[in-house]
UniProtKB/Swiss-Prot annotation:
Pfam families linked to this entry: Ribosomal_S5, Ribosomal_S5_C
Cross-referenced SUPFAM superfamilies: dsRNA-binding domain-like, Ribosomal protein S5 domain 2-like
Domain S5 DRBM: 17-80
Protein name: Small ribosomal subunit protein uS5c
Subunit composition and interactions: Part of the 30S ribosomal subunit. Contacts protein S4.
HAMAP family: Ribosomal_uS5_B
Molecular function (Gene Ontology), one example: rRNA binding
GO BP term, pick one: translation
PANTHER family per the UniProt record, alphabetical: MITOCHONDRIAL RIBOSOMAL PROTEIN S5
Coiled coil location: none
GO cellular component assignments: cyanelle; small ribosomal subunit
Amino acid sequence: MANRQKMSKTRDKKPDWQERVVQIRRVSKVVKGGKKLSFRAIVVIGNERGQVGVGIGKASDVINAVKKAAADGKKHVVEVPLTRSNSIPHPIDGIGGAARVIMRPSAEGTGVIAGGAVRTVLELAGVRNILAKQLGSNNPLNNARAAMNALSRLKTFSQFAKDRGVIAE
């Protein structure tokens, strides 16, 4: 029984999934005896083929915080529709806290023109040609959440046609 559980755990972790740490921050909690220090990690996980997730983890040491964040990221994976030129199908913007991210599709050969946490999210989602701008807050967590909010609301041409009751050719 224990051997089967080990095998299923190794099968879940596919080699094509990548994780990148966006931020590690030391945080403290004031308790009766003084300050209790812990670490908060923000990790982006993706397979570069249209699936990406952002996770947050807190622990008393950095390694466990990153592990928890990666596990949290796997729980919050979203599917991103990509075009033939590895861009997004249409312009969109997303909001996370006080951060706002505007994304626009771009032509082949443009590359990922974005900064900070948004760039990491887009690269691990598999987007190769895009223009993105961060507005408002420059907090990496809120910018990553804003990017995920935008990517989760993307639709393909056929999905728009289906929603409107039009037959797509």
